[in-house]
């Protein structure tokens, strides 16, 4: 079977990656992220209607009233929990609720900005801790430059996913942050599979250049990469299309992340390691 020379395309891939990162960073800079209630603070309402109310119609009616930053959930007890972000015209919510008949306000709570600020710090700390752990693990298992290659691919994926949320102005909440961390782990797993095969082939194959070894290794793991990515992508796409608003919002991170992560494990991580090895003129990679 003919081998695909992936790494011959790395300069074009660098251009694609640079464009993705540039667009993402510009959007994050000028549009920002649509942070959810978990990060901004707001007000929580729990109401119970006398008659049965469809959650989809309720969500659409609230949105039509000009309230954009909100979440709505239906409980097992038949009540609706509505969370509205700070700065939204909450005074319109009462008028919306009246359209669905008589209702009882069970509770109303304020989520303070202090709590939200703490959540932001925890989210950033979780991401930085994950990045540090990955760098340490790969640096010990392979070489520091390999670890940096994986981190570069990981940063590429996270920035692109965040950029996609910024461009579409989808809400970023704690569930989305968790999804991004899962996507990060998925991306690293893909990269480690390729790196492992490269290390194995470096020991077995003699008389080949590093680029040839890398291309061979990527081709050998290609079927596994494609099957794993397609399986995950089909599942994520199904839930993204058929799931409700909250689930669709989370699955958006998986859809974008799986596509970008598969691409980066080949064209970012491996390409970076190859060019760094060439830069320092190291013919072989010393493995742990």
UniProtKB/Swiss-Prot annotation:
Quaternary structure note: Forms a complex with SecD. Part of the essential Sec protein translocation apparatus which comprises SecA, SecYEG and auxiliary proteins SecDF. Other proteins may also be involved.
Name this protein carries in UniProt: Protein translocase subunit SecF
Topology in the lipid bilayer: Multi-pass membrane protein
Transmembrane segments: 13-33, 123-143, 145-165, 175-195, 226-248, 252-274
Location(s) in or outside the cell: Cell inner membrane
Family: Belongs to the SecD/SecF family. SecF subfamily.
Chief place of localization: membrane
PANTHER family found in the cross-reference section: PROTEIN TRANSLOCASE SUBUNIT SECF, PROTEIN-EXPORT MEMBRANE PROTEIN SEC
Organism placement in taxonomy: Bacteria, Pseudomonadati, Aquificota, Aquificia, Aquificales
GO BP, sorted A to Z: intracellular protein transmembrane transport; protein targeting; protein transport; protein transport by the Sec complex
Described purpose of this protein according to its UniProt entry: Part of the Sec protein translocase complex. Interacts with the SecYEG preprotein conducting channel. SecDF uses the proton motive force (PMF) to complete protein translocation after the ATP-dependent function of SecA.
Key words, A-Z: Cell inner membrane, Cell membrane, Membrane, Protein transport, Translocation, Transmembrane, Transmembrane helix, Transport
GO annotations of cellular component type: plasma membrane
This protein's encoding gene: secF
Cross-referenced Gene3D superfamilies: Multidrug efflux transporter AcrB transmembrane domain
Superkingdom of this protein's organism: Bacteria
Cross-referenced InterPro entries: SecD/SecF_arch_bac, SecD/SecF_bac, SecD/SecF_CS, SecD_SecF_C, SecD_SecF_C_bact, SecF_bac
An annotated Gene Ontology molecular function: protein-transporting ATPase activity
């Amino acid at each position: 079977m003919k081998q695909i020379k992936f790494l011959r395309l790395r300069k074009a891939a660098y251009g694609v990656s640079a464009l993705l990162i540039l667009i993402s960073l510009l959007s994050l800079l000028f549009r920002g992220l649509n942070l959810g209630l978990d990060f901004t603070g707001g007000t929580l309402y729990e109401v119970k209607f006398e008659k049965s109310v469809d959650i989809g119609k309720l969500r659409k009616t609230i949105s039509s009233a000009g309230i954009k930053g909100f979440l709505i959930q239906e409980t097992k007890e038949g009540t609706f929990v509505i969370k509205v972000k700070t700065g939204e015209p909450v005074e319109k919510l009462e008028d919306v609720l009246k359209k669905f008949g008589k209702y009882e306000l069970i509770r109303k709570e304020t989520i303070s900005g202090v709590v939200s600020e703490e959540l932001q710090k925890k989210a950033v700390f979780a991401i930085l801790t994950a990045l540090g752990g990955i760098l340490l693990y790969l640096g010990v298992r392979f070489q520091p430059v390999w670890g940096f290659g994986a981190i570069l691919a990981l940063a590429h994926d996270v920035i692109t996913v965040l950029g996609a949320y910024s461009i579409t102005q989808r809400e970023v909440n704690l569930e989305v942050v968790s999804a991004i961390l899962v996507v990060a782990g998925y991306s690293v797993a893909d990269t480690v599979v390729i790196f492992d095969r490269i290390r194995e082939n470096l020991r077995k194959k003699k008389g080949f250049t590093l680029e040839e070894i890398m291309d061979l290794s990527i081709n050998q793991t290609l079927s596994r990469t494609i099957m794993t990515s397609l399986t995950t992508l089909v599942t994520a796409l199904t839930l993204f299309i058929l799931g409700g608003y909250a689930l669709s919002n989370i699955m958006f991170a998986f859809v974008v992340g799986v596509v970008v992560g598969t691409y980066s494990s080949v064209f970012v991580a491996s390409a970076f390691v190859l060019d760094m090895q060439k830069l320092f003129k190291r013919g072989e990679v010393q493995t742990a």
